[in-house]
Amino acid sequence: MNIRTRMKYILLILFSLMGFLITSASADCVNCNFDEKNLANITFKDQNLSYASFKGAYLVNADFTGANLQGSVFDGAYANGAIFVGAQLDNSSFKSVELELANFTNASMRNVIFEGAYLVHARLTKKQVLESNFCDNLVEDAMKFIGWC
């Protein structure tokens, strides 16, 4: 086996280990940097990820149920189908994020920024829209929320 093949196996093992640690560890990850990472289908359930950065991350179907995401930054992320049920998202930023089919049921969303976000079929309540800065931001599918702002 040549060195290039060995390196591929080592990287595969390391990335698998990283996924295992993220999905099974319950340690806090305050101020963590996940920028540009592929975190599709990863479970962050009930974890403290406050002030974490997910800029440009691939978060399709990621599960943030009950997570503390206060002050986190998701700018430019691709998070279609992401689950934020019961998450604490106060003071977070979702600038230019793809959030099609994202579920924000029972999430706390005070002062959340959605500038340029794409929210087709996302689950948001009127209360969440009014608590966030949604009405102050240019949102791609704002027609869905006419009459709420």
Language-model-detected regions and their locations in the chain:
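N-terminal secretory signal peptides that target proteins for export/translocation
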Residues: 1-7
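Bacterial N-terminal signal peptides
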Residues: 12-20
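Tandem repeat scaffolds
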Residues: 23-149
